[in-house]
Regions:
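Protein maturation boundaries and topogenic segments
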Residues: 1-86, 154, 158-172
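Residue-level recognition of short, solvent-exposed, well-ordered loop/turn junctions
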Residues: 57, 72, 94, 135-136, ...
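RNA pseudouridine synthases
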Residues: 90-100
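Short strand-turn-strand beta-turns centered on an Asx-Gly dipeptide
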Residues: 108-110
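Soluble extracytoplasmic domains of inner/organellar membrane proteins
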Residues: 128-172
């Protein structure tokens, strides 16, 4: 009579007696890896509102890199605003840059900001920002692409780097 062989790798004896256990164990391992990736390295959010149109539409799902990044002008970031809410915005100025708002146009270091992503007229907002505004060390000036409806650094000033939770990787 043939002795039943235990399959160390499959976690079962000849046949399917322990096959369900092996499948469940593999599923849980994969689930654990996915949870770790999405809690440590990558974040997921949904765009709420029209402040980033035409680049991002209301309801779009975005993925962002949670690991510290070297944020640059033009980067789209996921950040916590002073109100405590989380929003997706674009960095238009970094530390040392001077932001000015003249006749509906934003100027960064004396150069008019232009880009295919911009929509609407840039108007000043009620808040603490007086122009020209110099971005302090470790801070970022963020705005929405749809300037007419966006609540952004024009009203609350530049964001400290620690309030930026990540740079967008993908959006659909």
């Amino acid at each position: 009579m043939k002795k039943k062989e235990y399959h160390r790798f499959l976690g079962k004896y000849d046949g399917y007696k322990y096959g369900w256990f092996c499948a469940a164990r593999e599923f849980l391992l994969i689930l654990l890896i996915v949870i770790i990736i999405f809690n440590v390295f990558v974040g997921v959010s949904r765009v709420d509102g029209s402040s980033m149109e035409p680049t991002l539409q209301h309801g779009e799902i975005v993925f962002f890199n949670r690991m510290g990044a070297d944020y640059q002008k033009g980067d789209i970031v996921f950040a916590r605003m002073p109100s405590g809410e989380y929003y997706v915005k674009r960095i238009i100025a970094v530390e040392g840059d001077e932001v000015d708002l003249v006749d509906g146009m934003l100027y960064i270091n004396g150069v008019a900001e232009t880009g295919a992503y911009m929509q609407g007229t840039t108007l000043p907002q009620e808040g603490i920002v007086a122009y020209p505004y110099t971005v302090e060390e470790g801070m970022y000036f963020v705005v929405g692409d749809n300037r007419e409806v966006s609540m952004d650094s024009r009203s609350f000033g530049a964001l400290v780097e620690s309030s930026i939770k990540g740079k967008l990787l993908l959006f659909q």
